[in-house]
Amino acid sequence: MLIRKWKAGLLAGLSILALASSADAGEVRMTVAEYSAKTGPYFEEVKKAFEAENPGITLNFEVVPWDVLLQKLTTDISAGTNADLSIIGTRWLIDFVQQGIAEPLDGYMNDEFKGRFIETFLSPSVLDGKTYGLPIAASARAMYYNKDLFEKAGIKNPPANWDELKADAAKIKALGGENYGFGLQGKEIETDVYYYYAMWSYGTEILNKDGTSGLSTPGALEAAKLYKSMIDDGLTQPGVTSYAREDVQNLFKQGKVGMMITAPFLSNQIKEEAPNLKYGVAAIPAGPTGARGTYGVTDSVIMFQNSKNKEEAWKVLDFLFQKDWRAKFTQNEGFLPVNKEEAKMDYYVNNADLAAFTALLPDARFAPVIPGWEEIADITSNAMQSIYLGKGEPDAVLKDAAAKADAILKK
């Protein structure tokens, strides 16, 4: 795991942070995660507008694909050539804080600035009472459904629970052809998360109250058996473990999947790539007791502690988190608003898709901000792949995964 290697390179001490980031005086550099083809052009607009308002500061962005972002940061930090600012997955933040890499931002923020944010999305970046990151991207997860397939299959409403989902998926399968009831992700980023949706609905959390893994609990087992039964009954697309999130989304956009769970950015993709597709957005199905959960996600901007231009870097952050620039970014990428004033804009208030996601926020869980989280997520993903492929009985696979996760949690 990259974070483990990354930690190992820094455990010798924090002398690396004494190395200056390579920005010149008056220059601010920011590493940016690429969310879509719109990301780069947006930040070019920001650069032009910011430099026009701040003639003494040069602003440069480096846009990096998500799948290599952590490796890029690892390399730059190890060499002392990191930028002044960077977007990171908030779930990585604790590692950056523990290694003294992220600068606390509270000393730069006044009440007006802090008051811009919706607390739900700012709080994951607060550790031990200090704010180390600002939420630049936020989303939750909900269930998309294909209205045309529902109509053909005689389904009137989206399923309220997993039993109804299985029944509806069977009706869609019965239509024949390349029609799949439920799109199930089985590889790459968020394979573990797709499992958590069912796990949460069966009353199980990722971590038990005593801090141990929840993977060996009865609810975790029932959730795994649920997904495996859908695979065995042919209610999902074939070859689940060869489908990443984007692959399942593509099947949905092609009109081949009746239901799938994903983020609000799919709505933007449908409007641009499949404008004739009739779809709806509904809550993730509930479990036997009515419990349900969605995945809340934030990405944060951090300031590096070794930045030579912190005051200038803060000006960039203040600029980026103004309402109009936030709204343009959020709407381009299909995220949820993190700015209170932005959330009041007509675009959000009158957007039925986003309203469906917002309604689920009271049930949102965020990835635990704990050391070793990425390794634990990998363990969970690998376990689910083994179960989906039939390489082991769910009970045994989950107990083994829980033991591996607990070993990390005890470190």
UniProtKB/Swiss-Prot annotation:
One of its GO terms (biological process) is maltose transport. The keyword Transport applies. It is found in: Periplasm. The keyword Nucleotide-binding does not apply. GO terms for cellular component: ATP-binding cassette (ABC) transporter complex, substrate-binding subunit-containing; periplasmic space. PROSITE patterns: SBP_BACTERIAL_1. Keywords: Periplasm, Signal, Transport. It comes from the Bacteria. Its main location: periplasm. Pfam families: SBP_bac_1. Residues 1-25 form the signal peptide. GO terms for molecular function: maltose binding. CDD domains: PBP2_TMBP_like (cd13585). The complex is composed of two ATP-binding proteins (BAB2_0493), two transmembrane proteins (BAB2_0490) and a solute-binding protein (BAB2_0491). Probably part of an ABC transporter complex. Belongs to the bacterial solute-binding protein 1 family. PANTHER family: MALTOSE-BINDING PERIPLASMIC PROTEIN, MALTOSE_MALTODEXTRIN-BINDING PERIPLASMIC PROTEIN. This is Putative binding protein BAB2_0491. It comes from Brucella abortus (strain 2308).
